[in-house]
Amino acid sequence: MIKRYTCQNGVRIVLENNPTVRSVAIGVWIGTGSRHETPEINGISHFLEHMFFKGTSTKSAREIAESFDRIGGQVNAFTSKEYTCYYAKVLDEHANYALDVLADMFFHSTFDENELKKEKNVVYEEIKMYEDAPDDIVHDLLSKATYGNHSLGYPILGTEETLASFNGDSLRQYMHDYYTPDRVVISVAGNISDSFIKDVEKWFGSYEAKGKATGLEKPEFHTEKLTRKKETEQAHLCLGFKGLEVGHERIYDLIVLNNVLGGSMSSRLFQDVREDKGLAYSVYSYHSSYEDSGMLTIYGGTGANQLQQLSETIQETLATLKRDGITSKELENSKEQMKGSLMLSLESTNSKMSRNGKNELLLGKHKTLDEIINELNAVNLERVNGLARQLFTEDYALALISPSGNMPS
């Protein structure tokens, strides 16, 4: 059972106890990411995430790393378009210690100038590494094709130019503006008692920051076709279709539809593109949901001489799906697969912590396992096939990275 508590300052705490495990996962979730940036500070959310590990007033960067290594724990962080998360997984006996270290990073990071300089170079290398992975960067190009100059189209890593401008003052200002109590959720899952909520509150329940009023601009969904010429071994193709926002009433219809289309080895795309025609090693689809927008993405990578055939095969798969719909067998298989994935994820304290943290941060509510199963069971052929006809139109965005940069016809 999930326990929810809101501190006096607005910080929300969610805790789910599972006495059958010996681990505890703790996540500090903040409702800010690259979407909340301006062009001048694009990448600051991600860089701030890096700098949290570079030293506090009581610990050096090495001591932060050693803090978790010596207890056999794990600590990490990630930045997305709409949120940032710092998390740790430790044995239950070390839960309070892990909380203390995470809180120390949150409240007492020093942003030392020498560490800033070194970490900028680390992120420069991360950007270069990303540039050397066209199967990754093509997704950023698709975001640009879909959202244009809106901040949802910004790269999470930022650019070398914006990164160069960051300093301790700009990081502290960004924290002041966006790391405010109303944007913070602490999610805890594992073998932990409800009294741990009070331990979290001691750290996070009293700090104050007014922050910055941010009425987010709703993005328009563009259907640009962007190409980039790059010396690669393969052509990397992405198609983007307008999807559904977080919490949409038909989100489970879309989850099932995406799974049938390209979410598994038995999916239409995998079978048509890879198994039947041998055109690609990697082909898949996925859905991204944001506060007020969403996108269903199809990706395929193939030799440049097979790009046209790959594009045609994807279009044929979509046309067949729209015309004939999915079958009752595909529907039932997909629903059972989703249920199985959900049940297996519940065995992981990290997965529970992540699920609860995101639900609290983005939706402000939680569904029980039975409620989710009931919603999946309610998905039917009419709803899924109707959604397929609605989504898969000629109005889609496209991104391509290839040696020639030539668009498939």
Swiss-Prot record:
Example GO molecular function: metal ion binding
Family matches, as PROSITE patterns: INSULINASE (PS00143)
Domain of life: Bacteria
Cofactor(s) named in the record: Zn(2+)
Protein name: Uncharacterized zinc protease YmxG
Enzyme Commission no: 3.4.24.-
SUPFAM superfamilies, per the entry: LuxS/MPP-like metallohydrolase
A biological-process GO annotation: proteolysis
Family classification: Belongs to the peptidase M16 family.
UniProt keywords, alphabetically: Hydrolase, Metal-binding, Metalloprotease, Protease, Zinc
Cofactor note: Binds 1 zinc ion per subunit.
Record-annotated active site: E49 (proton acceptor)
Pfam families (alphabetical): Peptidase_M16, Peptidase_M16_C
Binding site for Zn(2+): H46, H50, E126
InterPro entries listed in its UniProt record: Metalloenz_LuxS/M16 (IPR011249), MPP/UQCRC_Complex (IPR050361), Pept_M16_N (IPR011765), Pept_M16_Zn_BS (IPR001431), Peptidase_M16_C (IPR007863)
